[in-house]
A protein has these predicted regions:
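Residue-level "hotspot" positions that anchor or transmit function at local structural transition points
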Residues: 10-11, 42
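Short, acidic loop-to-helix structural element flanking the phosphoryl-transfer center
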Residues: 1-10, 16-20
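Asp-based, Mg2+/Mn2+-dependent phosphohydrolase catalytic module
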Residues: 16, 21-118
């Protein structure tokens, strides 16, 4: 995805200290142009603030962004921010109808392709 020229931002409810530690441990921090946590916002997910701020920091309006989520609260936050949404719920929740509000639902991150981002 990054090789296609997309900017990647991380909008999370997790504390930044934890996020930074995980990204460093996995050596994947360099993939993210922006990292932003709801801990710096007045409200966490499902409020859209963390997504709106991440889009702003990336230099985009939310309508130009695509959110990839795994949780229902995150999906609600991204939809409320007016982003296109791709959801990849845990297998146990894959058939839960509440995820049908997503624009695209996948079973695995491995299924995500550049075609989903058009």
């Amino acid at each position: 995805i990054k090789t296609k020229g997309f900017k990647i931002g991380l909008a999370t409810s997790s504390p930044m200290a934890l996020v930074d530690a995980v990204l460093a441990r996995l050596n994947i921090g360099h993939y993210f142009a922006v990292r932003h946590s709801a801990e710096f916002e007045e409200y966490g997910k499902p409020h859209p603030a963390v997504y709106i701020q991440t889009a702003t920091q990336l230099g985009f309006v939310p309508q130009e962004c695509i959110a990839v989520e795994d949780s229902f609260n995150g999906l609600l936050a991204a939809k409320s921010a007016t982003m296109k949404t791709i959801v990849i719920p845990e297998a146990i929740n894959a058939n839960n109808s509440r995820f049908s509000i997503a624009d695209i639902q996948l079973s695995s991150l491995a299924e995500l392709s550049a075609d989903h981002l058009n």
